[in-house]
A protein has these predicted regions:
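Helix-interface capping motifs at the ends of transmembrane segments in multi-pass membrane proteins
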Residues: 14-47, 72, 350-367
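Generic enzyme active-site microenvironment
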Residues: 18, 91, 267, 289, ...
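Conserved ATP-binding TGD loop and adjacent catalytic N/P-domain core of P-type ATPases
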Residues: 87, 167-169, 201-203, 209-347
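Conserved catalytic phosphorylation-site environment of P-type ATPases
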Residues: 39, 52-126, 280, 290, ...
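A short beta-strand->alpha-helix segment at the C-terminal rim
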Residues: 137-148
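Single conserved hydrophobic/aromatic residue that forms the stacking wall/gate
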Residues: 1-8, 12
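ATP-driven catalytic headpiece of P-type ATPases
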Residues: 85-92, 98-131, 161-242, 320-321
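Hydrophobic transmembrane alpha-helical segments of multi-pass transport and channel proteins
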Residues: 48-55, 129-130, 353-354
Length: 367
């Protein structure tokens, strides 16, 4: 695809050649010698030498690419550097883009007669054999506190509900509010706290021993420190910010509110992001920001694909721009850089054309 700014150069070259030919013919038809007429035509070509015009875009692109690389923003092509500044909508994948992509323990709420360490120790023993992504957060938290996990037996994972196992003669269970509520006595106050955690976009995991609730451990994929500021900067630039996620609406709304996005599209399946981008493109020029394998089709479909540097190779290959620092704040920085480069190109082209508007008539003998 030719660079947008190269179109002006192509038109200019054709027009200059046409003007030179017309100049030569006019001087011949007005009775002047062929040498004089030819000299006028050649003068037009010489004075309109497109050096300034030819350098207007490449120099600005080179400087823009250099500044981008210096700041950890890689523009793969000149087109991506020129087009990023025209973006009207930015679609952000939630996991790994707005959030850290690594669930972590955010709250530990033990029952009245249970300590935090006791709750974590029993949760550690139960979750140690789990392969669920949320289990990793609890294991890391317990390990960071120097806790040790006791060995459990008769371990069972119940997809969509939770876990159960035997610890000596006792039965341990852990999982969702709905699951634990059917097997253990949950106080109204703890249930209320669990609801509030869920409304805040966190996942409350309840743990019980022999039918007695031990407490709640909340796990969440927290947003990056710079996410909210990056979203605000994009909005201040007149850009509509959309968050895409496969989460349920309640969790998605909570994360979206923390980040401050304009629109939340929840329940998006991994293979459904491309169709969402297609529909967004009907409203304006779209940039998609993502980091995962399932983001690659959407990155390709968007007008500008922006990949987080810490993401998968497939996402990076599919993108037009790569943020090497994996910071969301580099998205508005990349767009600002593109706009500054475009502004520089337009200024360079203006002065190049201004010179020729004055010089060509002089060379042609009009003045």
């Amino acid at each position: 695809t030719p660079k947008p700014s190269s179109a002006a150069s192509d038109v200019y070259k054709r027009q200059v050649i046409t003007i030179a030919i017309i100049t030569t013919i006019v001087w011949l038809l007005t009775g002047h010698e062929a040498g004089y007429a030819l000299a006028r035509g050649i003068s037009v070509l010489v004075i309109s030498c497109p050096c300034a015009l030819g350098l207007a875009t490449p120099v600005a692109i080179m400087v823009g690419n250099g500044m981008g690389a210096k700041n950890g923003i890689l523009f793969k092509t000149a087109v991506s550097l020129e087009e990023a500044g025209k973006v009207q909508i930015v679609a952000l994948d939630k996991t790994g883009t707005i959030t850290n992509g690594q669930p972590e323990v955010t709250d530990i709420l033990p029952a009245d007669d249970v300590s935090e360490n006791d709750l974590l120790t029993l949760a550690y023993a139960l979750e140690k054999k789990s392969e669920h992504p949320l289990a990793k957060a609890i294991l890391e938290k317990a390990a960071s506190l120097g806790l040790t996990a006791q060995e459990v037996t008769e371990f069972q994972a119940l997809p969509g509900n939770g876990l159960s196992a035997k610890l000596g003669a006792s039965t341990l269970i852990g999982g969702s509010m709905k699951y634990i509520n059917t097997l253990a006595a949950v106080s109204p106050s703890l249930m209320n706290q669990a609801e509030k955690l869920a409304e805040a976009g966190k996942t409350p995991l309840l743990f019980a021993k022999d039918g007695k609730l031990l407490g709640i451990i909340a796990v969440a994929d927290v947003i990056k420190p710079d996410s909210a500021q990056a979203v605000k900067e994009l909005q201040n630039m007149g850009i509509h910010v959309v968050m895409l996620t496969g989460d349920n609406k309640r969790t998605a709304r909570a994360i979206g509110a923390q980040a401050g996005v304009d629109q939340v599209i929840a329940g998006v399946l991994p293979d459904g992001k491309e169709s969402v981008i297609r529909s967004l493109k009907e409203k304006g020029k779209v940039a998609m920001v993502g980091d995962g394998i399932n983001d690659a089709p959407a990155l390709t479909r968007a007008d500008i694909g922006i990949a987080i540097g810490a993401g998968t190779d497939i996402a990076i290959d599919a993108a037009d721009i790569v943020l090497m620092k994996s910071q969301l704040s580099d998205v508005p920085a990349a767009i600002r850089m593109s706009r500054a480069t475009l502004r520089n190109i337009h200024e360079n082209l203006f002065w190049a054309f201004f010179y020729n508007i004055i010089g060509i008539p002089l060379a042609a003998g009009v003045w």
